[in-house]
Amino acid sequence: MRLATWNVNSIRSRVDRAVAFLEHTGTDVLALQETKCKDEQFPHEAFRAAGYDVATFGFSQWNGVAIVSRVGLDDVEKGYPTQPLFGAEPALEARAIGATCGGVRVWSLYVPHGRSVGHPHYDYKLEWLTNLRAQAAGWLAPGTGDPAAQVALVGDWNVAPRDTDVWDLAVFADATHVTPPEREAFAAFEGAGYTEVTRVHLPEDRRYTYWDYQRLRFPRNEGMRIDFAYVSPAVAARTTAVTIERDERKGTAPSDHVPVVLELAD
């Protein structure tokens, strides 16, 4: 099975690119982030015409996640249990959607940005990751879950775990994505029983997944590695390869992120 994750940065602007990507890569399951539309605005028909089922979670032009699958799409959950609320009038944001696809419990995740260190959104980000980690640990724990469960937590994590996951650490001084609390919250998923398999298969430094649109960041390869896949032991054992589809940052109207693809043995 081929499982991909992609922050598409507006699915309505990039539906043709997304469908073309599915077709030319033979991807079976695609987790999307930053779809930026309500559920009823999502271009479902384009994916159905290509042979895929779709589950979406979106309220507005902000955030939004989806899962596209041609190997089943069962037991859809919008938001994870204990997902924290945010806002002046606290509400659930469209940042997590789960579904069982081909026997794997796939979660498409769009982790909060954090905005700036000390901002309420930064605290929300840390709480969001901490709560997700607790849930994910329970899914694998004997008694509350199944240690042999097939679970994949994929998406835009908005954390650069290593200094070499950004092109110039000095640029990020006092900024989000690289602070010790964020990195610790990200690393805690290892202690919950998960393996970040993109690093296992692509250990090289400066293998970025995101380049800002401004200041010629992509031509200069001034990027960030912030799109990852934490998977359960059962899925880690099946993962034979990972690719970062850098060419998707080229061409007309690309997203600022590129797909990350996992190959899972049958």
Model features per residue range: what roles?
Residues 35-38, 42-116:
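Structured beta-strand-rich core segments of catalytic domains in phosphoester-bond hydrolases
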Residues 9, 36, 81, 112, ...:
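Catalytic metal-binding/acid-base residues of hydrolase active sites
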Residues 243-266:
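Surface polyanion/phosphate-binding segment centered on an Asp-His-Pro turn
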Residues 80-87, 111-130, 170-174:
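Surface-exposed cleft-lining segments at the edges of enzyme active sites
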Residues 1-56, 62-65, 161:
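N-terminal, active-site-proximal structural segment of metallo-dependent hydrolase catalytic domains
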Residues 50, 128-226:
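Metal-dependent phosphoesterases centered on the DNase I-like endonuclease/exonuclease/phosphatase
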Residues 61-76, 205, 217-238, 264:
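Conserved beta strand-loop-helix elements of the APE1-like EEP
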Residues 1-10, 103-118, 257:
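Active-site-proximal beta-strand elements of phosphoester/diester hydrolases
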